[in-house]
């Protein structure tokens, strides 16, 4: 399966043509440049090789996510294709989480230290987005609970009484 960008296959773009426009506006090199620029601004250039990113189509309503164990930023291609102007703010938001975790240890996720990094980067320190997520939520599948053989027997015995 050919990859157009980290985490994105040709087949995914065929199924979601709006993502092709996002990838044209935000190629991997541009995202890496933005990430490196903010790390330089924060004076943590030593983390440029530690922090990586990719598109992650399993995200539904989250614009992005920071994975601490892997020092990885995951970006939602479907949501950000609708709002390409939000790629940079989301990238910086998630990068700030990774930097805070690496340099300061466990902290309040959107606490004072994280807000400081966001302010230095010139981005909003708002923790959540209000982007249109219509059609992106998973459809809930209602499943009937299977009853074990024992519970069926108990029900049958109760009916006999």
Where in the sequence are the language-model features?
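Walker B catalytic acidic pair
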Residues: 94
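Active-site-proximal or metal-binding-adjacent scaffold patches in catalytic folds
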Residues: 1-89, 98-161
């Amino acid at each position: 399966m050919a990859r157009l960008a980290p985490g994105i296959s040709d087949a995914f773009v065929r199924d979601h043509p709006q993502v092709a426009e996002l990838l044209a506006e935000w190629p991997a090199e541009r995202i890496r440049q933005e990430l490196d620029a903010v790390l330089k601004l924060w004076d943590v250039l030593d983390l440029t090789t530690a922090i990586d990113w990719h598109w992650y189509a399993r995200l539904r309503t989250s614009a992005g996510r920071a994975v601490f164990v892997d020092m990885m930023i995951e970006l939602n291609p479907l949501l950000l294709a609708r709002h390409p102007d939000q790629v940079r703010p989301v990238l910086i938001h998630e990068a700030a989480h990774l930097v805070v975790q690496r340099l300061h240890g466990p902290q309040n996720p959107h606490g004072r230290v994280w807000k400081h990094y966001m302010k230095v980067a010139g981005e909003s320190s708002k923790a959540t987005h209000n982007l249109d997520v219509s059609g992106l939520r998973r459809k809930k599948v209602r499943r009937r609970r299977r009853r074990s053989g024992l519970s069926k027997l108990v029900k049958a015995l109760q009916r006999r009484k």
